[in-house]
Amino acid sequence: IDLTTLSGDDTAGKVERLCEKAKRPISLNLLEQLGLQQGDIQVGAVCVYHHLIKEAKKNLPKNIPVAAVSTGFPAGLSSFKTRKLEITESIKNGADEIDIVINRGFVLQNNWKKLYEEVADFKKAAKNKHIKAILGVGDLETLRNVAKASMVCMMAGADFIKTSTGKESINANLNNSLVMLRMIRQFYQMTGKKIGFKPAGGISTAKTVIEFLILVMEELGHDWINPKYLRIGASSLLIDIERQLYHFALGRYANKEKLAIG
């Protein structure tokens, strides 16, 4: 899980609370019931707005990466100069990963060359940091556009392709994810390079995650079932996972109110 807070009311205090949850995603009592120790279960990263990176870095150990949403999130329609500057500032502030937002207009206008050049420039600005290209699948109109945008972003240097900002009317689902996974597989067959996949938006239950895990396993195989190549972007998913583990260990569900969210 990329444990995420990307709301208009985000504050330093809210990020600090999220980081505490990231450090202890499952309560100590529940870990004991499961026969696990603190550190056995860890989030993939903490994802925040670029201006809150320092706050996240201050409250997290080095083994938990901080991902910053940059490039005019969520619309991706700021000027190119401004969006590129956000990447530079995010890295200066300590971001380990950069989630970029593509300009969906390039896709809708079939301007694939411009999309390639922009993502390649963002990759160059990010230097050695991993970038996740957010396609905004709900805005791309057709699955053919989703497929083409996926391939262009991978060719331009994206380390991950991500379904959504979470702000669109249509976010990650099995249909658009299948298309993206098929493109990842095709790219791997052509180049030998593995690209990561990040579904995001509306994923709030463990049951839904299992469906995505099965899809990734069927399309790409076991090598992709790890944080290096698979992340789930979510803000409330961890609460449901903890409830399911509670049920597994104790035979009953805990009320959500009794599970710490930060």
Specify the residue positions occupied by each region the protein language model found.
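N-terminal beta-loop-helix "entrance" segment that forms/cooperates
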Residues: 240
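Alpha/beta enzyme core
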Residues: 9-41, 50-197, 204-235, 243-262
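Generic N-terminal amphipathic, Lys/Arg-enriched alpha-helix
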Residues: 1-6
